[in-house]
Amino acid sequence: MSGFRNRIQSWGKGLGTVLSDSIGDESSEKTSRSIQHNHYEEDDALPPVHLIGYSEKTKNRLLSKEMCEELRQLMPTRIQLYTEWTLLYSLEQHGASLHSLYDKLKYDTNNNARVGYVIVIRDRKGGIFGGYANETFHPTDSRRYYGNGECFLWKMEKVPDLQLHDKHDCKQDSHNWQLRGFPYTGENEFSIYCTSTFLSMGAGDGHYGLWIDDGLFRGVTFPSMTFGNDILSREGSKFHIVGVEVWRVG
């Protein structure tokens, strides 16, 4: 457990102020377990991320470089150093099918390397959330969970900028992207569980932290013991999927 505590402390280094009331009505206890990022000092800046794989015709792109910079701060140090993020699966580019998602990841030539994987989901209300996995998502024949303590869940939303602006500057964007990450708690080992009919991350007390169906049409999200997460979707515990992407980091 000491290693886990050290990891949680390292996640908190250099973080901005926690805006406990900015997203929903989460309790202070849940907020204290979550990790939020606003910006970092220039001395801590990593080389910029390069996104590879979007088609020129892809209109609904879920991931931006700004979001990548926030997400990479939660990843293991060796993964943070990678600058290339490669799109392996996109609902818009490859079709709405969990089988297609698994198939695209199955033939990833780097799936045996020390890389990471990010799943990004958008719901009908514009909420963007997902998870990070230390290994590729793949179905298992038996009820077997995989993944390790590097896995986490996350959600990202636009929140009000608390800095005071001149009243004449009302036309400028007064919102910032803010990430809330939910790291591995050590309470159980239910990081990732995938079958031919669903993909999930986190579990406990009969609920999944994140679960999506084989048609990539619907999903559910509940607080889980694995990650101590809040409900991830803006729609609530049950959500409709608008977009899904899976990226390889490294």
Curated annotation (Swiss-Prot):
Cellular component, GO, one term: nucleus
Alphabetical UniProt keywords: Mitochondrion
GO biological process terms, semicolon-separated: response to oxidative stress
Superkingdom field: Eukaryota
Main location: mitochondrion
A Pfam family annotated for this UniProt entry: TLD
SMART domains linked to this entry: TLDc (SM00584)
Subcellular location: Mitochondrion
Ranges of residues in domain TLDc: 61-250
Function: May be involved in protection from oxidative damage.
Family membership: Belongs to the OXR1 family.
Protein name: Oxidation resistance protein 1
Gene behind this protein: OXR1
